């Protein structure tokens, strides 16, 4: 059996989807072993990078597979890969015990479509739903809504993309 400290990080992407008012899409996750309470069940779309796939392509694919959204314009990305560890108590059950956490590349995009495009119950490509509901949320609230072990990543994402929320609203006429 591989020791927790020797496990690799799963290569993933995350997507901050901003609407015309500069608010961020968050989805309420379906139940999972990593959830600690009902407050920390919200997150932005994220997912794994397939072998040979570049991160930006993976981010667009994951966004579509989780939300049905394709109408986006890239605003920015975080140069660094952000890393988090999952708690040791769930590491053996999460991802079949193959990873100790995730290594994520984060992107910010402007949503150029209409809210009717968003479908988390029957998402794009016939993929299994990961969210049961969704809403637009002020960016500064995001770290308090995510499971605690992901909070440092969300704090960094919010810090890096804070100006983009204002820009998204200005460009779209929302601010």
Curated annotation (Swiss-Prot):
Query: Biological process GO annotation list?
Result: nucleoside phosphate metabolic process; ribose phosphate metabolic process
> According to the lineage, what is the superkingdom?
Bacteria
Top class in the EC scheme: hydrolase
Please list the residue ranges annotated as the Nudix hydrolase domain. Answer: 8-159
Q: Which Pfam families match?
A: NUDIX
Tell me what this protein is called.
Answer: RNA pyrophosphohydrolase
Cofactor(s) required for function per UniProt: a divalent metal cation
Question: PANTHER family this protein is in?
Answer: NUDIX HYDROLASE 26, CHLOROPLASTIC (PTHR11839:SF22), UDP/ADP-SUGAR PYROPHOSPHATASE (PTHR11839)
> What Gene Ontology molecular-function terms does this entry list?
bis(5'-adenosyl)-pentaphosphatase activity; guanosine-3',5'-bis(diphosphate) 3'-diphosphatase activity
Coiled-coil segments, which residues?
Answer: none
Which InterPro entries did the record assign?
NUDIX_hydrolase-like_dom_sf, NUDIX_hydrolase_dom, RppH
Record keywords, A-Z: Hydrolase
Q: What does this protein do?
A: Accelerates the degradation of transcripts by removing pyrophosphate from the 5'-end of triphosphorylated RNA, leading to a more labile monophosphorylated state that can stimulate subsequent ribonuclease cleavage.
By sequence similarity, the record places it as follows: Belongs to the Nudix hydrolase family. RppH subfamily.
User: Per the UniProt record, which EC number(s) apply here?
Assistant: 3.6.1.-
Residue window of motif Nudix box: 47-68
């Amino acid at each position: 059996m591989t020791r927790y400290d020797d496990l690799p990080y799963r290569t993933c992407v995350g997507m901050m989807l901003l609407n015309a008012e500069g608010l961020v899409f968050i989805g309420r996750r379906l139940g999972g072993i990593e959830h600690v309470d009902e407050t920390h069940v919200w997150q932005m779309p994220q997912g794994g990078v397939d072998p040979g796939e570049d991160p930006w392509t993976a981010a667009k694919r994951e966004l579509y597979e989780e939300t049905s959204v394709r109408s986006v314009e890239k605003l920015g990305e975080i140069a660094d890969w952000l890393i988090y560890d999952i708690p040791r108590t769930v590491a053996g059950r999460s991802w079949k015990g193959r990873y100790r956490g995730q290594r994520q590349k984060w992107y910010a995009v402007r949503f150029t479509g209409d809210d009717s495009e968003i479908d988390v119950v029957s998402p794009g490509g016939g993929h299994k739903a990961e969210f049961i509901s969704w809403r637009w949320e002020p960016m500064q609230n995001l770290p308090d809504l995510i499971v605690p072990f992901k909070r440092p990543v969300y704090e960094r994402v919010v810090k890096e993309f804070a100006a983009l929320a204002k820009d998204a609203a200005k460009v779209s006429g929302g601010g």
